Regions:
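Bacterial N-terminal signal peptides that target proteins for export
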Residues: 1-11, 15
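C-terminal segment of classical bacterial N-terminal signal peptides
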Residues: 15-24
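Boundary of Sec targeting at the N-terminus
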Residues: 25-29
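Short, aromatic-enriched amphipathic alpha-helices that serve as compact interaction elements
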Residues: 31-51
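Stable alpha-helical elements in mature extracytoplasmic
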Residues: 35-39, 60, 68, 162
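Surface-exposed, charged secondary-structure patches
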Residues: 65-130
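Low-complexity, intrinsically disordered terminal/linker segments enriched in charged
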Residues: 114-119, 123-135, 149-173
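A short, surface-exposed beta-strand/turn
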Residues: 135-146
Length: 173
């Protein structure tokens, strides 16, 4: 009976995956010890989503929010509250992971984590229609690497630090 139950469970999970019910966000574990490994998984989710037609299978900046440091999480929460108040799009009007709104990723290169004590940086280079560079700044909190800031280094307004943008935004509008 157990074998039948296990087979039924496996079949259900497989069909849910085929239907796009299992969201991409759940697939990038926040427990990865190396921040570069985690970032590779995040960008792989975007690659997979390009091939998926399911809206439930689309990655989002929520992947970063789940792994944000306490200070960055507070800034993300402030921005989310602004959106929830019906003010439309607030500080973040694009997906900073891919440095755009639409994406066609190629040549994704996640560099190694450069660790100095309880801080680390990881540089990600990729093409999203044009060449892009994002630098992720991590801090160790509660024994885990957390994203403390992201700096997009491409485009006419570069560099753009996400933490600074969230801090400086006029939420009274």
């Amino acid at each position: 009976m157990t074998a039948i139950r296990n087979w039924a469970l496996a079949a259900t999970i497989a069909s849910m995956n085929l239907m796009g019910v299992v969201e991409a966000r759940a697939q990038a574990s926040t427990g990865d010890a190396d921040p570069a490994v985690w970032l590779r998984k995040v960008y792989e989710l975007y690659h997979r989503a390009e091939r998926s037609l399911s809206p439930n299978n689309q990655p989002s900046t929520g992947l970063v929010v789940k792994r944000a440091s306490k200070s960055l999480a507070a800034l993300f929460e402030r921005d989310a509250d602004c959106v929830a108040e019906g003010k439309g799009t607030c500080a973040l009007d694009w997906d900073f992971v891919i440095d755009g709104q639409d994406w066609k990723l190629s040549n994704v290169q996640v560099g190694p984590a450069v660790v100095t004590g309880d801080k680390a940086t990881v540089t990600v280079r990729f093409k999203n229609f044009v060449s892009c560079v994002n630098v992720y700044f991590f801090v160790r909190e509660d024994g885990r690497w957390k994203v403390d800031d992201i700096e997009t280094q491409s485009g006419k307004d570069a560099p753009i630090g996400i933490a600074k943008m969230l801090k400086d935004y006029d939420y009274s509008r």
